[in-house]
């Protein structure tokens, strides 16, 4: 192994992960999700309405919004007010798609759930941390509906988590931090279920290419990370 990780981790090692449940008072579900130095506040809000195209269908809806605080990065970023950047739109669509895959919208009934992911501090992996924390916030919100008698059982079908994997000097590394993300020739974001079925794979090469064998290594490493993240999600939710 030629590349030495700045924080001393092994290639297959996650950064320290923590879920601080019920971080805010008024949302149906909330969690401060931390992955190393990346911190994302994820909240789930439930409203008794659906988009017009679902009226009368008996089916619910889930969507997501993603933002970064101006001071989340080393240099202050301007707030996105009237128009969202292409990056922000792409990320919030990814979060929404990923979390819709794990919920039975028919069983939810005609309700809408909004997952808000606000990045308080960014050290790479903000979209993957948003998905992983967003699932926890969603599960907390649905548990409240069950406790209030508004749902008989949870419409969640399976856990969802996401992780990044990158190739640096030809070797795969799990859960990149910012210095590694900047150094990586190949960068992947992988979203999986608790059963390790794939939901989404995003991968790009910069000034290089990768082989099918390296792609398999990347997905194998992602599986290890997802398995650990789902276990941590379950541990956190068991204490709710």
From Swiss-Prot:
Stored PROSITE patterns: RIBONUCLEASE_PH (PS01277)
Reactions the enzyme catalyzes: tRNA(n+1) + phosphate = tRNA(n) + a ribonucleoside 5'-diphosphate
GO biological process: rRNA catabolic process; rRNA processing; tRNA processing
Disulfide feature: none
EC nos: 2.7.7.56
Binding site for phosphate: 87, 125-127
One Pfam family here: RNase_PH_C
Keywords: Nucleotidyltransferase, RNA-binding, rRNA processing, Transferase, tRNA processing, tRNA-binding
UniProt keyword tRNA processing, yes or no: yes
Family of this protein: Belongs to the RNase PH family.
Function: Phosphorolytic 3'-5' exoribonuclease that plays an important role in tRNA 3'-end maturation. Removes nucleotide residues following the 3'-CCA terminus of tRNAs; can also add nucleotides to the ends of RNA molecules by using nucleoside diphosphates as substrates, but this may not be physiologically important. Probably plays a role in initiation of 16S rRNA degradation (leading to ribosome degradation) during starvation.
Name by which UniProt lists this protein: Ribonuclease PH
């Amino acid at each position: 192994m030629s590349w030495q990780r700045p924080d001393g981790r092994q290639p297959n090692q996650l950064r320290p992960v923590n879920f601080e449940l019920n971080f805010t008072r008024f949302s149906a579900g909330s969690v401060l999700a931390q992955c190393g130095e990346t911190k994302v506040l994820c909240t789930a809000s439930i409203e008794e309405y659906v988009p017009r195209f679902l009226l009368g269908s008996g089916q619910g809806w889930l969507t997501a919004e993603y933002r970064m605080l101006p001071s989340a990065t080393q240099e202050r970023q301007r707030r996105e007010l009237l128009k969202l950047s292409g990056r922000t739109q792409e990320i919030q669509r990814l979060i929404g798609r990923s979390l819709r895959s794990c919920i039975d919208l028919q069983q939810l009934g005609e309700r809408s759930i909004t997952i808000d992911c606000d990045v308080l501090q960014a050290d790479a992996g903000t979209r993957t941390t948003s998905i992983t924390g967003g699932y926890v916030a969603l599960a907390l919100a649905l548990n409240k509906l069950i406790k209030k008698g508004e749902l008989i059982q949870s419409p969640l079908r399976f856990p969802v988590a996401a992780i990044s994997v990158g190739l640096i000097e030809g070797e795969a590394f799990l859960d990149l931090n910012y210095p590694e993300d900047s150094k990586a020739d190949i960068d992947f974001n992988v979203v999986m279920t608790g059963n390790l079925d794939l939901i989404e794979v995003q991968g790009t090469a910069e000034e290089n290419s990768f082989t099918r064998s390296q792609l398999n290594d990347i997905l194998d490493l992602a599986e290890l990370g997802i398995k650990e993240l789902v276990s941590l999600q379950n541990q956190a939710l068991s204490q709710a």
